[in-house]
Amino acid sequence: MPLIIEENILYCDLDGVLVDFEKGVKERMKKYPDDLNKTNMWITLRKTPNFYANLPWMPEGKALWSAIKDYNPVILTGCPKGGWSEADKRAWCARELGANVKVITCDTKDKPNFCSEGDILIDDRDVIKDAWIAKKGKYIHYAEGNLEYYIKEIERNL
């Protein structure tokens, strides 16, 4: 019987890592998310056709994707409640990253459910960091502006 070696999965968040959600909100609502009433913001975005499908890349998003795409990353993206954003996010990924890229959509709090020991998550928010690490995953808290550091950090953890 052959020995099967499972490789760790590299997961990459979408909003704030590859996709510029904040810029999209600013273009649509004339203010950044932190300056808006969240209930009103989500109501407006839900009513905006193809909001997520039409979001721009983050400034370093294409360079980051270029650096990690050969590791076959899986997009692991949190979605707002109501099921209205999943198709848009999948459409963006198919168009910009390729139809062969696996995309998992879920509530942000459920992201750690996809973690196995050694799996890596690149995410701009640290709300699930402790839960990811508790499952023996590796967590890279990503922020724009230091791309070379993050690429080295990803490669070091693979």
Give residue spans per PLM region.
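Active-site neighborhood of HAD-like aspartate-dependent phosphohydrolases
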Residues: 1-49, 134
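Conserved Lys-Pro-Asp/Glu-containing loop-to-beta segment of HAD-superfamily phosphomonoesterases
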Residues: 9, 104-132
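Short hydrophobic segments within beta-strands
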Residues: 13, 76-78, 122
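Short catalytic/ligand-binding loop motif for oxyanion handling, primarily in non-cytosolic enzymes
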Residues: 19-21, 27, 73, 82-86, ...
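Short, acidic loop-to-helix structural element flanking the phosphoryl-transfer center
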Residues: 46-75, 82-87
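Short, structured coil segments at secondary-structure junctions
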Residues: 69, 99, 134-136
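A short, structured active-site edge motif that brings together acidic residues
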Residues: 74-84, 90, 95-114
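Acidic, Mg2+-coordinating phosphoryl-transfer loop and its flanking beta/alpha structural elements
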Residues: 120-154
